[in-house]
UniProtKB/Swiss-Prot annotation:
Keywords: Cytoplasm, Lipid A biosynthesis, Lipid biosynthesis, Lipid metabolism, Lyase. The lineage of its organism: Bacteria, Pseudomonadati, Pseudomonadota, Alphaproteobacteria, Rickettsiales. GO terms for cellular component: cytoplasm; membrane. Involved in unsaturated fatty acids biosynthesis. Catalyzes the dehydration of short chain beta-hydroxyacyl-ACPs and long chain saturated and unsaturated beta-hydroxyacyl-ACPs. The active site is at residue 49. It is an enzyme of class 4 (lyase). It catalyses: a (3R)-hydroxyacyl-[ACP] = a (2E)-enoyl-[ACP] + H2O. This is 3-hydroxyacyl-[acyl-carrier-protein] dehydratase FabZ. Its main location: cytoplasm. It comes from Ehrlichia ruminantium (strain Gardel).
Amino acid sequence: MQFNIQDIIKMLPHSYPFLLLDKVTACVPNESATAIKNVTFNEPFFIGHFPNNPVMPGVLIVEAMAQACLVCVMSDSKHNFENYTIYFMSIELAKFRKPVIPGDILTIEVNVIHKRKDTCRFQCFARVDQALASEAQILAMIKKN
């Protein structure tokens, strides 16, 4: 499955400036997803991080990973954000290996590594030109509203 920005807007509860995914290039519901974030100089966070050396904040890279995790789960026909809420319970083993700067295309890969009842653990990777920029494990809880 693939999703364009209009599909993502319908799938996720986020909006500008916090919607960080531009497209999803591959998705197997409840298994894996690959998403793209086009990092541009016009991002509002670059105003202060850092004015003379713009670097995407690591916390926003992790947020982009979390949004890809949401797509992975919400693309399942039985889930949608109107009827379900996903709560992030933990972010573990986060590592930032390479700065992400304006002009980069951030490719985010998430894989479900453990699922039990209403919780999912994801292994997440963010790459620029196939070089690992960041990685983390995210634990999330899916609750019916």
